Every structure is written in C-alpha cells, then in structure tokens.
C-alpha cells in the first residue's frame, strides 16, 4: 500500500516538473520570437507598433536565445519523445526568424510572414504534444482551424 502511494506521489511530482519545463520553454520561445518580431518590424518586414533598433535588439535576441537554450534542456530531461521532437521543430523554425533579422536570410515581408506562420504551426504542434504528454484532454484548436483567426481582423475594419 505504501509503495503504490509513494509511486503516485512521485508520478505527480514528475508531472509537475514536466509542466514547469514545458511552460518555461514555451515562455522562452515566445520571448525569443517577440524580440525577433520587433527586430523584423525595425527592418520593415513585420507590422508591429514597437519596432526594435538593430543594436539593442540583437543583444536582447542573444539573451533570449540563451534562455531558450536553458529551457530546452529541461524539456530534453523531462519530456517525452513526441514533445522533444516538437520542441526541436519549434526551435528550428524560431531560428529561421532569427536568420531574417540577422541578415543571414534575405526576403520580403511576405517571406517573413510565411516563416512566422510556419513557426506558429510548429508552436501549435508543440502545445499539442505537451498537452498529450501531460494528459490534458481538453480540446485544442489549431490556428489554421480557428474561426476567430480565420475571420476578419477587427483592427482592419
């Protein structure tokens, strides 16, 4: 009896740690791509109200990349295979955005938008994998299927 209770408690603790790792990575990748988006706005590739100048932005991007890397290590340690693969795909698509703002990849605003949408799709896939790993059964709607996103943007009315 004691042994089964101990195992349940241990499983609960690992689930909590896994949740923390997944959330930390999601937050770190969001910070990274937010800085990249603001840098892209400063280059005229993206329409955001708070563009960042290259000198300040690249330093912030480097800091965000360090944090993203640290957070990824926790996903590697605590995550299941599917979530780890989804996190790797997500980071690769985030790096594409970084290449645009570091002038390592040329392109137009349309190219940036396409790369950003691909990143968003990979982010959705990461969330789906993380939710499955954590046993979250509530429905999750992909951006590509969400009627709110597919409808007209009220900012453009």
For each of these PLM feature ranges, what is it?
Residues 1-157:
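Conserved non-transmembrane functional hotspots
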């Amino acid at each position: 009896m004691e042994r089964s209770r101990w195992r349940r408690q241990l499983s609960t603790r690992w689930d909590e740690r896994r949740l923390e790792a997944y959330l930390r990575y999601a937050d770190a990748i969001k910070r990274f791509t937010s800085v990249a988006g603001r840098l892209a706005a400063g280059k005229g590739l993206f329409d955001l109200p708070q563009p960042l100048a290259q000198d300040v932005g690249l330093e912030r991007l480097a800091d965000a990349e360090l944090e993203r890397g640290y957070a990824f290590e926790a996903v590697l340690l605590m995550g299941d295979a599917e979530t780890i693969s989804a996190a790797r795909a997500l980071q690769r698509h985030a790096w594409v955005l970084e290449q645009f703002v570091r002038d390592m990849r040329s392109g137009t605003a349309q190219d940036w938008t396409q790369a950003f949408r691909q990143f968003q799709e990979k982010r959705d896939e990461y969330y789906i994998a993380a939710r499955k790993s954590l046993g979250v059964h509530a429905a999750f709607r992909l951006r590509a299927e969400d009627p709110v996103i597919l409808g007209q943007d009220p900012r453009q009315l």
